[in-house]
Amino acid sequence: FFFLPSLIGGLVSAIK
């Protein structure tokens, strides 16, 4: 998938 990185990145940004 190519949209997973975006979702993961968003979650990581929210966590950080």
From Swiss-Prot:
It is found in: Secreted; Target cell membrane. Keywords: Amidation, Antibiotic, Antimicrobial, Membrane, Secreted, Target cell membrane, Target membrane. Expressed by the venom gland. GO terms for cellular component: extracellular region; membrane; other organism cell membrane. The keyword Secreted applies. GO terms for biological process: defense response to Gram-positive bacterium; killing of cells of another organism. The modification Lysine amide is found at K16. Belongs to the non-disulfide-bridged peptide (NDBP) superfamily. Short antimicrobial peptide (group 4) family. Probably forms pores in target membranes. Has antibacterial activity against Gram-positive bacteria S.aureus NBRC 13276 (MIC=25-50 uM) and B.subtilis NBRC 3009 (MIC=1.3-2.5 uM) but not against Gram-negative bacterium E.coli NBRC 3972. This is Peptide Im-6.
